[in-house]
Amino acid sequence: MGPLMVLFCLLFLYPGLADSAPSCPQNVNISGGTFTLSHGWAPGSLLTYSCPQGLYPSPASRLCKSSGQWQTPGATRSLSKAVCKPVRCPAPVSFENGIYTPRLGSYPVGGNVSFECEDGFILRGSPVRHCCPNGMWDGETAVCDNGAGHCPNPGISLGAVRTGFRFGHGDKVRYRCSSNLVLTGSSERECQGNGVWSGTEPICRQPYSYDFPEDVAPALGTSFSHMLGATNPTQKTKESLGRKIQIQRSGHLNLYLLLDCSQSVSENDFLIFKESASLMVDRIFSFEINVSVAIITFASEPRVLMSVLNDNSRDMTEVISSLENANYKDHENGTGTNTYAALNSVYLMMNNQMRLLGMETMAWQEIRHAIILLTDGKSNMGGSPKTAVDHIREILNINQKRNDYLDIYAIGVGKLDVDWRELNELGSKKDGERHAFILQDTKALHQVFEHMLDVSKLTDTICGVGNMSANASDQERTPWHVTIKPKSQETCRGALISDQWVLTAAHCFRDGNDHSLWRVNVGDPKSRWGKEFLIEKAVISPGFDVFAKKNQGILEFYGDDIALLKLAQKVKMSTHARPICLPCTMEANLALRRPQGSTCRDHENELLNKQSVPAHFVALNGSKLNINLKMGVEWTSCAEVVSQEKTMFPNLTDVREVVTDQFLCSGTQEDESPCKGESGGAVFLERRFRFFQVGLVSWGLYNPCLGSADKNSRKRAPRSKVPPPRDFHINLFRMQPWLRQHLGDVLNFLPL
């Protein structure tokens, strides 16, 4: 038999060698929906179903196998017919110290659930929540709290079960979701010494749910703005150096962009991945920070297109060029999704840089790292990606003190075989932030990256940043603090709230309206960073009149004790001069990492949410001193002491004639009391490494500096003193109409 006859017989016995590879059946329509194919009807093609808003596909996708049959990822049995099912939002499993209505097993799109608290408890969060078409509730978790714990009541998200009901320092709470729901966020949280719960608020969600771009963009932007604020925001670059910036002690950011290029990603989707990453690079280089960018694409194996060890990683043009040259076909021989290998490439890059710089050097230890993973599927080869994350955390020595040195953002794209549990496991867990998301498609991803870092907004909103390192000066710790002087005598203090406005007390100016000889000293007066400014305009509250109630036997009254000073020049921002955050503004909202749509009341509930709130003011010598603001019933007992002051208020019958609800109260035996000359200074809190002014020093019953010429000498009042020390501070939450009237063009105020 000749060679041609042998070949003919082989083709007859194995007809598959002569025909093209089998294709999958085309009877895959979905009732009420549509579908797309990544590679036609050929083996390896991913079929993705879509449904109208408010419905979700079941199954979400199918894969064409080499046998010519469709397989549903994760399914244990074949589904004969794909259908669109109605989206439902999870129901509350329990709600403490209150009631909710209506009580349903789950809620339809458009449905509402309302919450009310029992007597003695205050509602935090949203009183009414709305079920959205993506299967998520709008608003925030409703909590009925009495402020009794060291940490506020962490609440129970809808669909979750919590164990642990003690909220003292070191206490832990644990969460799990009811059946068929997926937990994102932290399954365990601990009450920390600063009164804040560790980790991220847990959310129970349907497996088919996804995030809207308008929710993801501000969440990512808020987290990034916090990170950027800690990464050398004042370092300037020179174009002549081609943006080539050396690693410095003042801080450096390594940004790692990981782009999925596996079989389930279409060429068009990969293009949008690249465009989104380019947007991020463009935004990040718009900030005056030291940054290096790594680019890694991956399928079955990773390809490092740009390493942070390459000098070009610090050049925006070179990084974007590397992205543009990324080729979809480079991975066509590897069809799997090896997320472990991609993250391990980051680990190896870090390890090489650590060896180059030295593990114990500040140059290595001061680098902050951010990883953004863009994927449309579940890791299906190479081992657990969590193992690589554990190695990364270990090499960076990530612990409670160094938690801010690593951020991992895990972003799933498309309603495919995206695994919520895996994304949540990879994403960082930080208080008030989210790091794991699923978006409906790559167009939504592009929209997120367009809006998450709007430089025009963020450069004016980095407020409340103080340097808390051990070697920082007092002024660097509180860079908003200013001194107000008539001629040469120091009289009052104030707080920088923008680059040209100072907030202070009205009684500093009660002796006349001519302020031409007054000066405001901004920055450290003992160094080259200090500078004196003339006052262009003083705005005194018209309601302030210290003698307004003299006829009632009240010799001095400090209601409306608030003033604004507009400086003749703008202040150049530096580590010694930077505004503090004012609550009820968009700037403070970003710093608090709160969602869009937050209100002034939300800020008050978050900042003044306990019976005794730790706070601070700045002393004459520039040091930061501690007080406790009394709220609720403790405010009443704090203020009642005024009735014992017979010199200033000899005929007082009602304490509230002197201490109105405009005032915050402090001054117990454990507290410091402000001295004369410290009036007008900020009363401020620390939250999430940022500082927020909630009041300003107004008046008190005791002057600890009386009779002393030494700024560092303060005398505590004897325990037998009558009346005991009490101090009163203008509550900025009660002065909102006046602040909005005069600062509406300066700050971006939230709804009341």
Curated annotation (Swiss-Prot):
One of its GO terms (biological process) is innate immune response. Disulfide bonds join C24-C64, C51-C84, C89-C131, C117-C144, C151-C191, C177-C204, C463-C581, C492-C508, C584-C600, C638-C665, C675-C705. Its EC number is 3.4.21.43. Mg(2+) binds at S262, S264, T337. It holds the Pfam family VWA. The record marks R243, K244 as: Cleavage. Keywords: Complement pathway, Disulfide bond, Glycoprotein, Hydrolase, Immunity, Innate immunity, Magnesium, Manganese, Metal-binding, Protease, Repeat, Secreted, Serine protease, Signal, Sushi. Residues 464-744 form the Peptidase S1 domain. Coiled coil: none annotated. Residues 1-20 form the signal peptide. PROSITE patterns: SUSHI (PS50923), TRYPSIN_DOM (PS50240), TRYPSIN_HIS (PS00134), TRYPSIN_SER (PS00135), VWFA (PS50234). Its main location: secreted. A motif (MIDAS-like motif) lies at residues 260-264. It is found in: Secreted; Cell surface. CDD domains: CCP, Tryp_SPc, vWA_complement_factors. Residues 22-86, 87-146, 149-206 form the Sushi domain. GO terms for cellular component: extracellular region. Cleaved and activated by different proteases depending on the complement pathway to generate complement C2a and serine protease complement C2b chains. Cleaved and activated by C1S following activation by the classical complement system. Cleaved and activated by MASP2 following activation by the lectin complement system. Cleaved and activated by GZMK following activation by the GZMK complement system. Residues 254-452 form the VWFA domain. The MIDAS-like motif in the VWFA domain binds divalent metal cations. This is Complement C2. It comes from Pan troglodytes. The gene is C2.
